Swiss-Prot record:
Belongs to the formate--tetrahydrofolate ligase family. PROSITE patterns: FTHFS_1, FTHFS_2. Its EC number is 6.3.4.3. ATP binds at T67, P68, A69, G70, E71, G72, K73, T74. Coiled coil: none annotated. GO terms for biological process: tetrahydrofolate interconversion. It catalyses: (6S)-5,6,7,8-tetrahydrofolate + formate + ATP = (6R)-10-formyltetrahydrofolate + ADP + phosphate. Pfam families: FTHFS. The gene is fhs. This is Formate--tetrahydrofolate ligase. One of its GO terms (molecular function) is formate-tetrahydrofolate ligase activity. It is an enzyme of class 6 (ligase).
Length: 558
């Protein structure tokens, strides 16, 4: 049988006015700032008014290491939220906003897929409510003020060779990675090397997603390091006096966006930091607000459990005082086969042996999540080519790891297909076995925190750091940054730094190439391998196929 595309399904959605969606979770019309009929922001005054309520249960959705076969983490997040509502629970989902650049690069975007989507899909993948534009503007204002300060006498004695604040644009544009700024004569300032990152890689984005309120936002913005003097002392954004104006630009962007699923259940879609050099989770303010409004909140973290879940648990939960009741690890039969050595072209053919061979990757993720004291449920995201024998092989393996796997058909059937997963998740939560703990304490030395993640999560023999890196970490400790968590930046495709090393490898080391201080966001980035903070477009970007049809509808975006 033929299946409809995501965009066809989304266009058939019978959306309810956003005021109705807000009313489902107790948000009155006066507390919604509508952007059209189907999306709105939630007012800061409403958010403040619910802070004394008890929290609901937090459910984190993560996955195995991503493969080209696709795992469907967001699709499962949305499907589980709908499934919980279907079985009579008061639930909502919290996911990230899409970055504009990749939507015109690699084909795709979308929030979920099949019959487990959040709408309005096209708007969410384009300008949405303008949050990313506001972040780009705030970041760019600081960039302009730094160069302006240097131009008008450089009172702060900034070393123009050590301006570390790069510019941003929400587009994939490799030509901007390394540039020379201020060319063209004396009137244009002092020429220096500079460069652009994509907006989601901005520290401003990470800060917006970790700040508790506007006061916290301004303090974090002011704490960002933008440059160094000749004596290597840091220059902060507050020294440039940019933090106040940046906060003004971000005032509305701090308010969570509310939209709906295909089944008219509420969803917060807010923020979208890089899952690599940042923590890859939606905003703290959206998650904490949702927990005050619903009994069950389903959220996700970028990439696999070794990156996204580790950062969610060690960074976001630590900073926001959150504790998940259960973690859902998404796996697919196709990905198990790929981890078991099957080529992508052959994934449609039954191969139980390959499924069994590929389960080691899943097993390590289950073990890792359990080490945080949180129970695990495995969601087998169903593909039409899966056979009963292959699904059973995954279930048997998961059972051998002390967890339970549930087949979920949300892509094909919506909440009807995810109801069994929802029932299992509620059953696990009601047992009350969660006893969340972070991987390392705040006062552990920074180098030991990096070792803890590399040994405890990746299962490396050790993290290799040279004297220069160790000295830098010690200096930051002496400057008062020693209690910050670490944010590992490495390939998402493997536990190692080699993206082609699948499964659950052992007997390897993790080379730490450099360390970066994100003082405003509040973490130390450990760069392992090459990090791309400004993507490029592929040979045939999807933008070539995007256009308006005769009816004014967008074609080619999905």
């Amino acid at each position: 049988m033929g299946y409809k595309s995501d965009i066809e399904i989304a266009r058939e959605a019978v959306k309810r006015p956003i005021q109705e969606i807000g009313a489902k979770i107790g948000i009155e019309s006066a507390d919604l700032l509508p952007y059209g009929h189907d999306k709105a922001k939630v007012s800061q005054s409403f958010i403040n008014s619910v802070q004394n309520r008890d929290n609901g249960h937090l459910i984190l959705v993560t996955a195995i290491n991503p493969t080209p076969a696709g795992e469907g983490k967001t699709t499962t997040t949305v499907g589980l939220g709908d499934g919980l509502n279907r079985i009579g629970k008061n639930a909502m989902v919290c996911i990230r906003e899409a970055s504009l650049g990749p939507n015109f690069g690699m084909k795709g975007g979308a929030a979920g897929g099949g019959y487990a989507q959040v709408v309005p899909m096209e708007e969410m993948n384009l300008h949405f409510t303008g949050d990313f534009h506001a972040i780009t503007s705030a970041h760019s204002l600081l960039s302009a003020m730094i160069d302006n300060h240097i131009y008008w006498g450089n009172e702060l004695e900034i070393d123009v060779r050590r301006v570390v604040w790069r510019r941003v644009v929400d587009m994939n544009d490799r030509a901007l990675r390394q540039i020379t700024a201020s060319l063209g004569g004396v009137a244009n300032g002092f020429p220096r090397e500079a460069g652009f990152d994509i907006t989601v890689a901005s520290e401003v984005m990470a800060i917006l997603c970790l700040a508790k309120d506007l006061k916290d936002l301004q303090e974090r913005l002011g704490a960002m390091i933008v440059a160094y003097r000749r004596d290597r002392s840091p220059v902060f954004a507050r020294d440039i006096k940019a933090d106040g104006a940046m906060t003004v630009l971000l005032k509305d962007a701090m308010q969570p966006n509310i939209v709906q699923t295909l089944e008219n259940n509420p969803a917060f879609v807010h923020g979208g930091p890089f899952a690599n050099i940042a923590h890859g989770c939606n905003s703290v303010i959206a998650t904490t607000t949702a927990l005050k409004l619903c009994d069950y909140v389903v959220t996700e973290a970028g990439f696999g459990a070794d990156l996204g879940a580790e950062k969610f648990l060690n960074i976001k939960c630590r900073k926001a005082g959150l504790a998940p009741s259960v973690v859902v690890v998404v796996a697919t039969v196709r990905a198990m086969k790929m981890n078991g050595g099957v080529a992508k072209a052959d994934l449609g053919a039954e191969n139980v042996d390959a499924v069994q061979n590929g389960c080691a990757n899943l097993g390590r993720h289950i073990e890792n999540v359990k080490s945080f004291g949180v129970p695990v449920v495995v969601a087998i995201n169903h593909f039409v080519t899966d056979t009963d024998a292959e699904v059973q092989a995954v279930k048997d393996y998961v059972a051998s790891q002390g967890a339970e796997a549930v087949l979920s058909r949300h892509w094909e059937l919506g909440s009807e297909g995810s109801a069994p997963l929802a029932e299992k998740v509620v059953e696990v939560i009601e047992k009350g076995e969660a006893n969340f703990q972070t991987l390392y304490p705040d006062d552990m030395p920074l180098a030991e925190k990096i070792q803890a993640v590399c040994k405890g999560i990746y299962r490396a023999d050790e993290a290799v750091m040279d004297k220069k890196i160790l000295d830098q970490l010690k200096l930051w400790e002496d400057q008062g940054y020693g209690k910050l968590p670490v944010c590992m930046a490495k390939t998402q495709y493997s536990f190692t730094t080699d993206p082609n090393e699948r499964g659950a490898p052992t007997g390897f080391t993790i080379p730490v190439r450099e360390v970066r201080l994100s003082a405003g966001a509040g973490f130390i980035v450990a760069v392992c391998g090459e990090i791309m903070t400004m993507p490029g477009l592929p040979r045939k970007p999807s933008a070539e196929a995007i256009h308006l049809n005769d009816d004014g509808q967008i074609e080619g975006l999905f």
